[in-house]
Amino acid sequence: MKKRLCAVLLASPLLFSAAVFADDAQQLRDKLIGTASLKADFKQTVTDVNKKVIQTGSGIFALAYPNQFYWHLTQPDESQIVADGKDLWIYNPFAEEVVIMDFAEAINASPIALLVHRDDATWSQYSVTKQQDCYEIKPKAIDSGILSVKVCFKNAQLANFNVADDKGNLSQFDLSNQQAITDKDKALFSFVLPDNVDVDDQRRKTAH
């Protein structure tokens, strides 16, 4: 009887921790669902392992359910990422190249795509820990260069997020001028292929 009681006491902290993490994940999902759509300006600051600023930038960020995402870095070098709900388009104007991927591959590449994803099976691959008004998302199996994503809210509104990679770099994104997506803004999630660019189509050929 004593051995059984001891085993229960030892297991209790583990069960409690799992329940807390599950609650944290659900809280984050509820907050994101409450943010059905969002458009904002962003400022980007990247620091290296020594906390030295190695890059700054700015641009426009937008998201909408389901699986729609828009990222336009305007300074210092332009780049664009668009998820239309099915495919992911990555455009590098300087290189005159467009890469096309399945949206599922974006999820695999970075937890940041969870901001617009509701699939239970996908969320189960990540652990979520609440830290005051922030939530840290970590992949349970590290198979990409992204170690964690932290998203922070202010007055129930997404305020900033950061991405930590396996090289010790931290990319911080601070949002401003947040507003809901308008009918006009919905065009942001439809990528128009520019003329005279190289196209690297990495989508599953069986699906297209």
Swiss-Prot record:
Residues 1-22 form the signal peptide. NCBIfam families: lolA (TIGR00547). Monomer. InterPro entries: LolA/LolB/LppX (IPR029046), OM_lipoprot_carrier_LolA-like (IPR004564), OM_lipoprot_carrier_LolA_Pbac (IPR018323). The gene is lolA. Participates in the translocation of lipoproteins from the inner membrane to the outer membrane. Only forms a complex with a lipoprotein if the residue after the N-terminal Cys is not an aspartate (The Asp acts as a targeting signal to indicate that the lipoprotein should stay in the inner membrane). The keyword Ubl conjugation does not apply. This is Outer-membrane lipoprotein carrier protein. SUPFAM superfamilies: Prokaryotic lipoproteins and lipoprotein localization factors (SSF89392). The keyword Transport applies. GO terms for cellular component: outer membrane-bounded periplasmic space. The lineage of its organism: Bacteria, Pseudomonadati, Pseudomonadota, Gammaproteobacteria, Alteromonadales. One of its GO terms (biological process) is lipoprotein localization to outer membrane.
